[in-house]
Amino acid sequence: MFNDKTIDIYIEGKEIKQIGEGLSFPADKILDGSRKAVIPGFVNAHTHAAMTLFRGFGDDMPLMPWLEQKIWPNEAKMTREDVYWGAKLACLEMIKSGTTTFFDMYQRPRVTADVT
């Protein structure tokens, strides 16, 4: 979008205060963003966060056999602590990949909320 221009982004604390050309503010740190993109955080509008614990578990199976034979029997055994640590892992992965907001659709929503 700004291929031929130098664009400055002034950040104060954790907040973007101003974006534009030739900004002049005191800086503790200056980063060269050449050949980089600045984008807003991603939003994951549908997740089952604690299911990160089931990643790769029967992933070669069709949906219904996978649910009936692998997922539902094991979900029935999940404890509050299992959901907590699965959701915590999911949150760390989402943060690492730029997700800033998510909507979880899994069991024990208050446990997932405790993670955040």
At which residue positions do the language-model features occur?
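N-terminal metal-binding scaffold of metallo-dependent hydrolase/deaminase domains
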Residues: 1-26, 36
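Divalent metal-coordination and catalytic microenvironments
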Residues: 14, 35, 46, 98, ...
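Residue-level structural signal for beta-strand termini and adjacent loop
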Residues: 21-24, 43, 55
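Conserved beta-strand scaffold positions in the cores of enzyme catalytic domains, especially
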Residues: 28-32
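A generic hydrophobic-helix recognition signal that picks specific residues
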Residues: 34-41, 91
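Histidine-centered catalytic micro-motifs
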Residues: 41-52
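Active-site gating loops and adjacent loop-to-helix segments of metal-dependent hydrolytic enzymes
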Residues: 53-85
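Active-site loop-helix segments enriched in His/Asp/Glu that coordinate
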Residues: 76-116
